[in-house]
């Protein structure tokens, strides 16, 4: 890994000895010099017990569930506060325009979203369906 950063710009620069902690539910971006696999060791989170605090402005979040889910349904409880959701491929969900071309939220992927107000995202358990 050459560099990665979290939602607030804190950087992980291993060649310079700069380290950060990953925060539960938060996403991060990584710039690498070649194809890489990131292995994260820890306890698997129960999505229904892990609310994600969303700040006003831009956020990067992790998708914590084990199965893909419809983006519109995942964000239905907070959609009035969501301006845009973006995946890593450039697909978007604009709630105000009733437009979504993100196929689904997928385990292991992160998402950027812009909030018009702070809110809390609460995922359903892995036993429930959207």
Where are these regions (language model features)?
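N-terminal exported-region signature
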Residues: 3-130
